[in-house]
Amino acid sequence: MRIRIVGAGAMGRGIAQWAATAGHTVELCDVRTEAVTAAVDFVRSMLERAVQKGRMSAEDSAATLERLIPLDDPWAQGPDVELVVEAVREDLDTKTEVFGRLEKALPATAVFATNTSSLSVTRIAAALEDPTRLAGLHFFNPVPLMKIVEIVPGAATRPEIPPALTALVESCGHRAVTVADTPGFLVNHAGRGLVTEALALLEEKVGDPADIDRIARDVLGLRMGPFELMDLTGLDVTAAVIDSIWQGFRHADRLRPSYLTPNRVAAGLHGRKTGRGWYAYGPEAPAPAPEPPVTGDADRPVFVHGTEGQARDAAALRTALTAAGAVVETGDGPSADALVLVPVWGTTVAAAVAGYGLPAGRAFGVDPLAAAGRRRVLAVTPAADPAAARDARAVLARAAQGEEPWAVSVVRDTAGSVAQRLLASIVSVAAGIAERSIAAPADVDLAVTAGLGYPVGPLAWGDRIGADRMLELHRALHRTTGDPRHRPSRWVTERAQLGLALTDPGTSPADCTSDAS
């Protein structure tokens, strides 16, 4: 296939390398000829590196470069061009102008594809004389390594184009998912679940960025915490995406932005690229502060209180602490000196203190969510005795013989604690994507694991917990906070009620009105 790529920036050169390596003839062009030269040099250096590392032969590298053709004029006639991929700056007027000029230069048989990450594919296509020829083809940077591509048909896109683009993408070694033309498409939309909830937790002073990041990594198993991720991406970029998707979905509560970001963006606290963000960077930046040492009395007796519905979590915590040698009291209530540990699921320690008459100074929350690493989370209320909290942290840090001690994060009491809130938001946003038929459930999980690097897809993650337990969590968060961002989605509610998995697309009305044959 002969492919013309318009735009020789980071994304355009990555797409060019990917397509040429897969055996396609690629015309690479830009209104700035120096950008094309730099892009070809970059691709050459990447291919040379691949040869040095033994991932490609010298002959294949040379053949790939021969298939990469620098083009001086983006609007040159191209009777043999079969596909155009536009990768210019993210501006509607610029993109429509590019396609308008290409429409005059290329044959009517050429398929047009835009690499837009945030603009409406339908609006870009609407400026063409033939809007049926255009679709979205959204790659992720760096293209050769990020092996997922979103195929986005516009409202007028010919039905044969998305399957053809899918076949092309998958023949070149990447995976393709078909996504509805909605704000943020799939991956950027799904990614809002983590960062918006992390910002909400920071607003509430539940923990600082380092606390929340540690919990995200060590409990949820994410490669990076949300604040580390925002610093890597750039807060200016992240905040703009959050605002754009929220506005695009008409201020949906689940996608609500934080008041924290505008001032930080204005102050230039963008992250790694400016040297300061949620963390400091550079040779003169101070080293990250270590976690406070564990200093309490690990032998102080504890009583594990199982609130209604949490008997299983309470029993599991008792068993784990007993195996670690902790002094775990039994009976109907705690002794006068015992710490009270309360496993919370979408609720607060404060509610347990009020509802069950627990000693406010000695009662603490423990997140029962199974940890990916060796970290536990202790929640403290405003009434907590600091000495008792230090002792509770020491007890939770205990480990069975031969095991590493647990790290213990101390956070402010909030509904569901940190990890539950983050996971509930991740699952809820993904469920909303499936519910709106923006993408199929399997594609949601595929795109999120490939595009965001999550250890498991969000819907499959919810299934690991159980649809009924996820619904219980969403309902408890909504009931406890009153915040509509935690309102259970129809997708989770129905599947919990019907005994279906969150990954199950279910039966649609269309399935019931036509024969399978």
Identify the residue ranges that each predicted region occupies.
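Glycine-rich Rossmann-fold phosphate-binding loop(s) that bind the pyrophosphate
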Residues: 8-9
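N-terminal Rossmann-fold NAD(P) dinucleotide-binding loop
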Residues: 12-13
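Aromatic pocket-lining residues of Rossmann-like dinucleotide-binding sites
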Residues: 19
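NAD(P)-dependent Rossmann-like dehydrogenase/reductase catalytic/cofactor-binding core
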Residues: 22-24, 174-177, 181, 209-435, ...
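Conserved beta-strand positions in the Rossmann-like core of class I SAM-dependent methyltransferases
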Residues: 27
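Rossmann-like NAD(P)-binding element
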Residues: 31-35, 48-111, 119, 322, ...
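Amphipathic alpha-helical segments at domain termini/boundaries
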Residues: 64-83, 164-173, 179-181, 396-405
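Rossmann-fold NAD(P)-binding glycine/threonine-rich loop
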Residues: 97-146, 153-166, 338-391
